[in-house]
Amino acid sequence: MGKTFNLTRREDGIAILTMDVPGETMNTLKAEFGPEISEILSEIKRDSSIRGLVLISGKKDSFVAGADISMLDACQTAGDAKALSQQGHVVFNELEALNIPVVAAIHGACLGGGLELALACHQRVCSDDGKTMLGVPEVQLGLLPGGGGTQRLPRLVGITTALDMMLTGKQIRPKQALKMGLVNDVVPQTILLQTAVEMALAGKQIAKPVKKSLVNQLLEGTGFGRNIIFDQAAKQVAKKTQGNYPAPAKIIDCVRQGIAKGMQKGLEVEASHFAELVVSKESEALRSIFFATTEMKKETGAEGATPRKVKKAVILGGGLMGGGIASVTTTKAKIPARVKDINEKGLSNALSYAYKLLDKGVKRRHMTPAARDNLMALMTTTTEYKGVKDADIVVEAVFEDLALKHQMVKDIERECGEHTIFASNTSSLPIGQIAQAASRPENVIGLHYFSPVEKMPLVEVIAHAKTSPETIATTVAFARKQGKTPIVVQDGAGFYVNRILALYMNEAAQLLLEGQSVEHLDKALVKFGFPVGPITLLDEVGIDVGAKISPILEKELGERFKAPAAFDKLLSDDRKGRKNGKGFYQYGAASKKKAVDETVYGVLGIKPGVDKEMSAVAERCVVQMLNEAVRCLDAGIIASPRDGDIGAIFGIGFPPFLGGPFHYIDTLGADNLVKILERYQTQYGDRFEPCQRLKAMAAEKARFF
């Protein structure tokens, strides 16, 4: 590898230090850079003609995107990780201690170690470009800022703001960064370097105090007040993480100790906590997700196939799903979308859906009204098949009715070109059955989004036996442009995500009928690590939707998918969930606090009894999901354990700190999982029978990774 840092001297005495990692599109910090930076800093100290220093990136749209995560996996022990953090401290302290002004000129991603580098500079100026974002997202990998970030950030922007940034991993836009005091100036990219040079020539400036509310001044200005901030943050973290993620509590401790005992002590605590987190099983799991998604971005979904460019999309159906799909097509992918619905109400719903989402951006000052209107102009509507002939892809989002979908296929083949892809958003019907109506079955594919479309990151791309590789590759590329994480799955009832979810939900329903309360069931699975409990999820998705999917899965996959009788009783009482304000929970203006509708127990003919241990409740639901995930792998529904992990995490919120179903099975041990399943099989019947692959793995002590 060639040199990453290049020092040039200007006639006015300002030196420019340009960072440009050879052979990479983005700058990342690597352990081997330490000696190179130290040598340059020594050179600067020796040269009395240098009056100031500007740090800038040689990359097009990246300042420094963070530390190279792969170097953490090279750490064999906590001691190795601690040494990495301490090396960063030495270099950044040396930079900060220079007796000349040091200015960071920031354009593009300035994240993690990149922001910590900028914080070690005396001043920061950033471009006003939309690509410029600043943040410390380490917590999302189960880590904390290990290059002095837990110490410098609170001292610059205040404790409350710094904790918010570090505990959420949120990324800050330029104007917001200026307002909070994170940067000293925001300028157009064209004059970024010039401005940074002028700042360096002006000399070290005394930092302007960040404007704080009176409450914040009182809290952050006294030891008693700071204790209130830290205690409140700790309570919120405990509630949010359920004790499953160690990083947030350690971030709070770093800041607390640094403020109370000084910078040096704070850095020592930071290095120690960073090291503990690097070797924690939670961070290892979260980093595995990061590497998996990074790897997947390089794949087309079909080996050797080249995706066609999608210049125009048509969405059939303007309902909740159709409106969401049209919205991400225009706003994220910037691809024109024509929405077709049989009535004007559906079309106005789709337009309103997209407008509301974009207008939120305007209200938050993330975009201008003109930018919103330009994106809205990409969406057009029709009640007939007009203006659809040149569509490259048609996404069907109509009712789950096979005859209706057959009609859609025939209509599109008649109205559109021979190359047009027909992508069905069905959640349960096998794609092969939909393709039976097609004269060009190679163009038919499944594209299963999750609700709400703009928030849920996963899509399942479902290939049936005759889907062409080019159709798969084009659909995968289209989904990525929409900002989605696609996994390619093979055809079959429920595909992957709904198939593993169905057994999990069925088991929760069984526990409910056995006398477990609604609240206890939901709390048990939230404590396990799911974002919401299974009963809340059923209310959100729709009890009627669950009732429609279950018979399809039972018919195709067998008795173990038979849903408990609860569905029929609930639907007879017109309980569909949130959508009609009547489900397991109370809805409406009167029920601000989430409360169970106690009348649901009477409808089900049950009376809540003694609650089981939360861990036992969660285990019964989760082992069903794990067993079925392995069946899906064995049947070729998913291509790899990696895809199964990503599908479960991004599709249904499987706890990320466990790494996904397959990583979790490795943690448990296949032999232990088989024992648990066999114990439940004895107690509750054959729906718990371990699949053959799990039994074989248990016998061989085999692992997935």
Curated annotation (Swiss-Prot):
Chief subcellular location: cytoplasm
Keywords recorded for this protein, A-Z: Cytoplasm, Fatty acid metabolism, Isomerase, Lipid degradation, Lipid metabolism, Lyase, Multifunctional enzyme, NAD, Oxidoreductase
E.C. designation(s): 4.2.1.17, 5.1.2.3, 1.1.1.35
Domain of life according to the entry: Bacteria
Site entry: Important for catalytic activity: E116, E138
An example Gene Ontology CC term for this record: cytoplasm
Pathway assignment: Lipid metabolism; fatty acid beta-oxidation
Record GO terms (molecular function): 3-hydroxybutyryl-CoA epimerase activity; enoyl-CoA hydratase activity; long-chain-3-hydroxyacyl-CoA dehydrogenase activity; NAD+ binding
One annotated GO biological process: fatty acid beta-oxidation
Subcellular location: Cytoplasm
Short name of one Pfam family: 3HCDH_N
Function: Catalyzes the formation of a hydroxyacyl-CoA by addition of water on enoyl-CoA. Also exhibits 3-hydroxyacyl-CoA epimerase and 3-hydroxyacyl-CoA dehydrogenase activities.
NCBIfam families xrefs: FadJ, PRK11154.1
Similarity comment text for this entry: In the N-terminal section; belongs to the enoyl-CoA hydratase/isomerase family.
PANTHER family, A to Z: TRIFUNCTIONAL ENZYME SUBUNIT ALPHA (PTHR43612), TRIFUNCTIONAL ENZYME SUBUNIT ALPHA, MITOCHONDRIAL (PTHR43612:SF3)
Subunit note: Heterotetramer of two alpha chains (FadJ) and two beta chains (FadI).
HAMAP family linked: FadJ
Name of the protein described by the UniProt record: Fatty acid oxidation complex subunit alpha
Gene: fadJ
